[in-house]
């Protein structure tokens, strides 16, 4: 009897997780505005990372090529909201550490993937 109750509880928890993760998966009317559209995740950039992802030129290229956009934002240590996909700076800037541990005036001086571009503030992206 214990195992049956445990199995039912685990199954119920799994169902709850699936419901919370994808509540609109079965609702076509919520997906329709996005169907058939291409989205540039982190901007529009080539395999050579030019322009580098999450840079203003990458987002401008997405618009020029007719893509919708999706991006991630992070807070710097001084609570500036910037467009940056990763939690850490390492992959895009070569600097080790968490985005949240650096003030924006330091992050904006870190070139993205060896380019002249830097991680923009979310407010810069919106302009």
Q: Which role fits each region the language model picked out?
A:
Residues 49-53:
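Short, solvent-exposed loop/turn segments at secondary-structure boundaries
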Residues 28-30:
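N-terminal targeting/anchor module and adjacent flexible "hinge" preceding the catalytic domain
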């Amino acid at each position: 009897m214990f195992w049956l109750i445990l199995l039912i509880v685990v199954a119920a928890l799994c169902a709850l997780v699936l419901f919370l993760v994808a509540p609109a998966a079965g609702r076509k009317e919520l997906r329709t505005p996005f169907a058939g559209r291409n989205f540039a995740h982190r901007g529009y950039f080539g395999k050579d990372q030019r322009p580098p992802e999450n840079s203003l030129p990458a987002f401008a290229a997405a618009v020029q090529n007719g893509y919708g956009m999706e991006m991630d934002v992070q807070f710097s240590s001084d609570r500036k909201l910037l467009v940056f996909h990763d939690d850490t700076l390492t992959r895009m800037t070569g600097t080790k550490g968490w985005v949240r541990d650096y003030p924006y005036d330091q992050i904006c001086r870190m070139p993205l993937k060896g380019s002249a571009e830097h991680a923009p503030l979310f407010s810069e992206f919106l302009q």
